[in-house]
Amino acid sequence: GVGREGMGTTCTAAMLEGERLVIAQVGDSRAYLLHQGKLQQLTRDHSLMADMIEAGQLTPEEARSHPNRSVITRALGSDPHTQPDLYETNVETGDRLLICSDGLSGMIFDDQIENTLRRVQDPQRCASQLVNEAIAAGGHDNVTVIVADVTGYAEVRRKKMARKTKLTVALVLVLLAALVGG
């Protein structure tokens, strides 16, 4: 439509099969894994700030207040040939997956995210708490958060179809939230 040229959205999707977690990501929505109580960022933002940090031109702290902090370098819809980055890792029972928009990761620091993921046991309540923390920090963007716990392999097999359906619905909601908020 008119005025939509160059517009796009971000997307981070996860697929868990057994102990193997595969992440597909375009844009600056992130995936994190809480493994043995330590938070690790699984994805790299497709953003001007990430490029500048990697090049040593900015610190992560400087990037948070930079006037171009919202500029993304890759998005769905902006180029028909856009390809996602793929990440693969193994997970264990007890790990916790977090997928979030930049409305979370741009407002609160990773140590606060890690603390909340460890402290709030219920995944839905944890996601709500993270959203509330981002808003309390002055959230100026949409805040979308999904928290999922890794359970035993036998349980994953039994619930495979139900989880795929729920994950698909959740990912569609993330995409819609990014479209509406962006």
Task: For every predicted segment, state its role.
Residues 1-182:
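PP2C/PPM-type serine/threonine phosphatase catalytic domain
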